[in-house]
Amino acid sequence: MKLIKPTLSIILSSILLINPLLAHHSAIAFDKSKTVTVSGVIARSVWRNPHMAINMNAEDDDGNQILWKIEGPGTTILSGQGFNKKMLMDATKNKEEITVVVHPLRSGKPGGLLQGITLANGDSYQVGEEYQDPS
């Protein structure tokens, strides 16, 4: 009987703590051996942790509009590279054309893991993991 309360406490704590871990995922969906550069107009963006996100409309080789879904690093990493929420929200509100460099999805669908972004005013930011200072 003495072990029931501690055991239940451990089980309940584990259940509560595992949920945030399940929300985060690996980058295995992205092909880190390749990079793709895509230009298009921002349709939507989200500035949040654990990842920021950009949806952008880009033209394919036939002139068709394709929605690209871009996942980026967390907001702390972005801010550390000089890229901030106001920049992203202003670009989204103004429906600016941006250029992104991404590791593409392995599935071939239009999307990728953000490595760099160039805004309409020409400002560029390298935000991918290979640009992060490990110190």
Language model region names:
Residues 80-99:
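Short nucleic-acid-contacting surface segments enriched for D/E, G, S/T with interspersed K/R
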Residues 1-6:
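Positively charged n-region of N-terminal signal peptides that target proteins for export
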Residues 7-20:
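Bacterial N-terminal signal peptides
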Residues 38-42:
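Conserved hydrophobic positions within beta-strands
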Residues 103-129:
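OB-fold/S1-family single-stranded nucleic acid-binding modules
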Residues 48-58:
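Short aromatic-glycine-enriched beta-strand elements
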